[in-house]
């Protein structure tokens, strides 16, 4: 069934609204994908904070005009699908890569992260990186560790002094009597 101009315009507008705030995308192609496989992929992408669509190449190119992922959607050939997010690109890449390992019918074409087009190899490398949350927690640990060590050292001086005084009291060295020489 051919799309009417009005229906094409509606699809372009809908996709354009979705892509407007997207900062990262992974474009792929597939052959003989079953409905259950497609459903599973959509679930994984949604769980990673993204959206997934099978797109007509020319409509996707028009819809992406003026967006950060425009460069990735220009000049596509063959069957194409796009997973996109405005959130963590690593989470999206991990979700897609995990699913692709189990489903050979799907292959990556390219990706785009913050306006930079990345190759299939770089998509795989992106999937192996730690996510934003993990990087932030490691960074906070590195920032907090020196202050924590300093506080421990400063507390140790007072604690050690208290231990010495306590030992002196227990042995009777501070009883007020002068020790004979």
Swiss-Prot record:
Record-linked InterPro entries: Ribosomal_uL10, Ribosomal_uL10-like_sf, Ribosomal_uL10_bac, Ribosomal_uL10_bac_type
GO molecular function: large ribosomal subunit rRNA binding
Function: Forms part of the ribosomal stalk, playing a central role in the interaction of the ribosome with GTP-bound translation factors.
Organism of provenance: Acidobacterium capsulatum (strain ATCC 51196 / DSM 11244 / BCRC 80197 / JCM 7670 / NBRC 15755 / NCIMB 13165 / 161)
GO biological process, one term: translation
Keyword Iron: no
Top-rank taxon, per record: Bacteria
Protein name in the entry: Large ribosomal subunit protein uL10
PANTHER family attached to this UniProt entry: 39S RIBOSOMAL PROTEIN L10, MITOCHONDRIAL
HAMAP family, sorted: Ribosomal_uL10 (MF_00362)
Quaternary structure note: Part of the ribosomal stalk of the 50S ribosomal subunit. The N-terminus interacts with L11 and the large rRNA to form the base of the stalk. The C-terminus forms an elongated spine to which L12 dimers bind in a sequential fashion forming a multimeric L10(L12)X complex.
UniProt record similarity statement: Belongs to the universal ribosomal protein uL10 family.
GO annotation, cellular component aspect: ribonucleoprotein complex; ribosome
Keyword presence, Cell membrane: no
Gene3D superfamilies the record matches: 3.30.70.1730, 6.10.250.290
Keyword field: Ribonucleoprotein, Ribosomal protein, RNA-binding, rRNA-binding
Record-annotated disulphide pairs: none
